[in-house]
A protein has these predicted regions:
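Generic secondary-structure boundary/loop-capping signal
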Residues: 2-4, 23, 47, 55, ...
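Lipid interaction determinants
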Residues: 6, 14-15, 40, 58, ...
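Intrinsically disordered, low-complexity boundary segments flanking structured domains
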Residues: 37, 44, 55-57, 87-94
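A short, surface-exposed loop/turn module that caps and links secondary-structure elements
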Residues: 43-66
Length: 111
């Protein structure tokens, strides 16, 4: 079963669903990577399946969030979108069981 993808705002949804809007706001290279990463999300059955874009925890963000590289210093940020986020015994998010995500941001990586 593919990942369920939601969006934090209508603007983010539009940016992710309209190539023209993405190109206009982010530039062609970043828009192409965004399209590819969204295709990766749609093809994955869980977040743990994601490899491209170097998914990683982001300092200063909620532990249920991951940043995924796009291009030219841009990234998009997803978070687990479960009422009860699956957790490991350690308390960390069990990304192998997360099958619902929300795109919460597209921004320049300031790390």
């Amino acid at each position: 079963m593919p990942l369920e993808i939601a969006f934090a705002t209508k603007k983010l949804r539009h940016l992710c669903e309209s190539e023209e809007a993405a190109r206009s706001s982010l530039g062609s290279g970043v828009a192409e990577k965004l399209k590819a990463r969204l295709a990766d999300l749609r093809a994955a059955s869980c977040v743990k399946d994601l490899v491209a874009g170097r998914p990683r925890h982001l300092a200063g963000r909620r532990p249920t969030s991951l940043g995924i590289n796009l291009s030219d210093g841009w990234r998009f940020v997803i978070c687990a979108n479960h009422n009860d986020v699956p957790q490991l015994k350690s308390g960390a998010v069990d990304w192998a069981r997360v099958n619902r995500v929300k795109v919460v941001d597209i921004d320049k990586d300031h790390a």
